[in-house]
A protein has these predicted regions:
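Outer-membrane beta-barrel domain signature, strongest for Gram-negative TonB-dependent receptors
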Residues: 1-99, 103-111, 127-132, 136-145, ...
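Signature of Gram-negative outer-membrane beta-barrel scaffolds
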Residues: 97-210
Length: 210
């Protein structure tokens, strides 16, 4: 049988989730009589997205590993700006369009783990229970005693640090940033050969840099 209690997860640290998404887009169209009635379209857009995620990473009743909901703790931020210009018009039997597109994006990612108050006694017990007995046997001929009664004190004994101070402020933090820029030039042209036959030619060139 399956013990349902083994399916339980615990959260003794904050599980705050804070996501913000905002953006702005504007489209402007100009009729250009000087170019035979051609139309110029400008589309400008900006977007900003951030997400903070706190969690109890060990999911146990002990305070072992956690993540803070801090901008430089465990977060993702995405910012992008784009600009597109299109010029469209008609010359005789040809409907033509030329355009350009530019985008600038930045992605920031902080990935942090911190150790909790129970990390040291947990790890000490895990390691100490395996090595203390053997260590005591090896040191006994030299009249060096080892406290095997409480494995939770293992790291403080071997390091000489006061109990509970060995991993204060410890953990890991990674920071990643990706920048991307994209430039594109494009055209789309339709030749109305007859009332029943059209020929369309399109071309696009894109250059991405990350």
């Amino acid at each position: 049988t399956i013990d349902a209690s083994q399916r339980l997860g615990y959260a003794n640290r904050s599980t705050e989730q804070d996501t913000k998404d905002k953006g702005l887009s504007a489209e402007v169209n100009w009729q250009m009589d000087a170019l035979g009635g051609a139309s110029l379209t400008s589309i400008t857009a900006y977007r900003d997205w951030t997400s903070l995620n706190a969690m109890d990473a060990d999911f146990s009743g002990a305070d072992l590993i956690f993540r803070d909901a801090d901008p430089k703790g465990h977060s993702t931020a995405f910012e992008t700006f784009s600009q597109e210009l299109r010029l469209t018009g008609t010359s005789g039997r040809v409907d033509w369009m030329i355009g350009a597109f530019w985008a600038d994006e930045t992605l920031d990612r902080y990935d942090q783990y911190q150790v909790g108050a129970h990390y040291e006694p947990y790890l000490s017990t895990l390691v100490g229970s395996q090595v203390l007995a053997g260590l005591a046997a090896q040191l006994a001929p030299m009249n060096i005693s080892v406290n095997t009664a409480n494995p939770a004190l293992f790291f403080s004994q071997v390091s000489g640090r006061p109990y509970g101070t060995g991993f204060i402020g410890g953990g890991s933090q990674d920071y990643y940033q990706q920048k991307a820029r994209s430039l594109a030039l494009f055209t789309n042209n339709t030749w109305h050969a007859t009332d029943q036959f059209d020929l369309t030619l399109g071309l696009r060139y894109t250059h991405d840099r990350k």
